[in-house]
């Protein structure tokens, strides 16, 4: 009888502790696992661009470190660019329901990590080709889908996009700087290790639950397929042409500025500082975008970006003096950042699934395809015209002044 009483007492004690445990776990999940939506978005940008800050500057160094020739490296990087273009254009638009954006981001982050882990498995050219294509195919849609999530949340909550997106720029600087230091200490092996850690962090961050889930109208069945795309392109072709010219004009800078400046007598460290200056200028404008451009329309921002492009690329072909290069790099906030802010403002004015579709086309065509195509031409022009390639880039940016969309997207006080 005494034993029975003891069992009952223990049972009651167990029930009490179970209730306390469940309540504690629920509290922890509520307080820790749930992240404010703007912080969730900032973390997503940070972890993505931290990883991209490793991949973009240093992946060719890793490929060279495992013994590949420059020609083979070029082929692999070219295949990656094509995969990035296709990933943004074909995968991102498949997410037609804004409420499924977070799930899509988590799946893509997982697939990207799996392909990054596959780089550890082998170094044959055939294997690397498959892995490069798979990695870029799933890595590239993360940006347009994250931007689409930002646009969706701007309709639901008060959010300063520039102050959120700036964490991506900060992360890019940190990722490239830390990896550069580690490469000097541990050679190329540090690159893949850092990339893997960055992608693990990205996946873990995206597994957290945002405080506000995205909501919106999913794509209607009758609007699906080619008619929806045809209508979108017909309505937005001026916008797409404009941003493609402005972003594509960066091709010579991305591909050949380091070579050009080193040939002019600057050390590799100085070239690195100049690149960092451009990103710092980008960070400043993203941070202050709400105050600086709150009343600017997308059309006005595109004009400012085009003017900055003509001035920047013209100066780059004209001088290699250090004061001129400092000004050239500060203008990065005008040629890239202002253009991107204009694009986000224009896209945010769309409705429903058009936000996701146009975001995907912008990322694929302007941020991917145009730069890839212009890089091919820039290589030919740099070989034959040398610094004259930057004058050509200034001419590329010039038509954007007249190609700006006639109907301005609405001014968004939160963008």
Label the predicted regions.
Residues 140-155, 338-351:
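Intracellular juxtamembrane helix-capping segments at the cytosolic ends
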């Amino acid at each position: 009888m005494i034993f029975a009483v003891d069992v009952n007492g223990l049972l009651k004690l167990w029930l009490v502790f179970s209730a306390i445990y469940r309540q504690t776990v629920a509290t922890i999940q509520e307080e820790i696992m749930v992240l404010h939506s703007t912080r969730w978005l900032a973390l997503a940008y940070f972890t993505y661009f931290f990883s991209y800050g490793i991949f973009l500057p240093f992946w060719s160094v890793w490929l060279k470190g495992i013994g590949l020739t420059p020609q083979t490296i070029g082929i692999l990087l070219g295949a990656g660019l094509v995969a990035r273009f296709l990933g943004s254009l074909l995968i991102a638009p498949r997410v037609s329901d804004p409420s499924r954006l977070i799930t899509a981001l988590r799946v893509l982050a997982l697939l990207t990590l799996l392909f990054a882990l596959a780089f550890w498995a082998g170094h044959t050219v055939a294997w690397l080709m498959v892995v490069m294509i798979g990695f870029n195919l799933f890595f590239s849609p993360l940006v347009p889908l994250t931007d689409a999530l930002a646009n969706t949340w701007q309709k639901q909550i008060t959010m300063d996009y520039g102050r959120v997106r700036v964490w991506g720029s900060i992360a890019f600087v940190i990722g490239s700087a830390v990896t550069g230091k580690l490469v000097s200490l541990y050679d190329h092996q540090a690159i893949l290790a850092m990339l893997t850690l960055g992608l693990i962090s990205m996946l873990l961050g995206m597994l957290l639950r945002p405080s506000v889930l995205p909501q919106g109208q999913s794509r209607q069945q009758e609007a699906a397929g080619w008619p929806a795309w045809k209508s979108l392109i017909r309505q937005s072709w001026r916008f797409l042409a404009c941003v493609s010219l402005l972003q594509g004009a960066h091709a010579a800078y991305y591909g050949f500025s380091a070579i050009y400046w080193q040939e002019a007598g600057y050390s590799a460290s100085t070239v690195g500082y100049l690149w960092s200056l451009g990103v710092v200028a980008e960070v400043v404008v993203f941070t202050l975008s709400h105050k600086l451009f709150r009343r600017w329309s997308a059309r006005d921002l595109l004009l400012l970006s085009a003017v900055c492009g003509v001035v920047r690329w013209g100066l780059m072909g004209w001088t290699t003096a250090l004061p001129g290069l400092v000004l050239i790099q500060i203008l990065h906030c005008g040629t890239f950042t202002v253009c991107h802010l204009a694009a986000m403002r224009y896209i945010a004015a769309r409705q429903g699934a058009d936000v996701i579709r146009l975001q995907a086309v912008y990322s694929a065509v302007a941020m991917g395809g145009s730069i890839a195509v212009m890089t091919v031409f820039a290589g030919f022009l740099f070989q034959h015209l040398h610094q004259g390639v930057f004058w050509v880039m200034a001419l590329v940016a010039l038509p954007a002044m007249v190609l700006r969309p006639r109907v301005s997207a609405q001014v968004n006080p939160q963008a």
